[in-house]
């Protein structure tokens, strides 16, 4: 199992994943809501949109914009079960465990924190 840092470095080598960045609007939303709220949103999105064994619209359940967590999901290849399978070898067709959900949320939050530390793009 890779560390979060190793995973983020690997994701940066993907031209598609590396193109995602938080917008100024996303950054302001995070500042207004606070990281605790963003983390709760991330946990809720993962639990409801990614964790079920069967996701009816897999590959289309995560919008490309509209919330900082959505951007992080695409940047971290945690946007759909197909990407989770391709990048992290998480089997499709079974519910994500609580531990898997927590690891995904930690990865998303680490990506968001890194984006905030880098400043505006």
Q: Model segments located where?
A:
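Iron-sulfur (Fe-S) cluster-binding segments and ferredoxin-like electron-carrier domains
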Residues: 82-108
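Immediate flanking context of iron-sulfur cluster ligation sites
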Residues: 56-76
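Core of compact, soluble alpha-helical bundle domains
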Residues: 1-47
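Short Fe-S-cluster ligation motifs
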Residues: 102-121
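Short, hydrophobic/amphipathic alpha-helical patches that form generic packing surfaces
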Residues: 40-48, 82-86, 110
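RNA-interacting cores
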Residues: 3, 86-90, 114
């Amino acid at each position: 199992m890779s560390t979060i840092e190793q995973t983020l470095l690997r994701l940066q080598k993907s031209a598609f994943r590396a193109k995602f960045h938080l917008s100024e609007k996303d950054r302001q939303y995070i500042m207004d809501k606070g990281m605790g709220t963003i983390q709760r949103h991330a946990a809720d999105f993962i639990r409801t949109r990614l964790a079920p064994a069967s996701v009816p619209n897999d590959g289309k359940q995560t919008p490309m914009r509209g919330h900082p967590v959505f951007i992080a999901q695409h940047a971290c290849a945690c946007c759909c079960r197909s990407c989770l399978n391709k990048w992290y070898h998480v089997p499709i067709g079974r519910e994500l465990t609580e531990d898997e959900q927590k690891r995904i949320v930690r990865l998303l939050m680490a990506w968001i924190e890194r984006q905030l530390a880098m400043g505006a793009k």
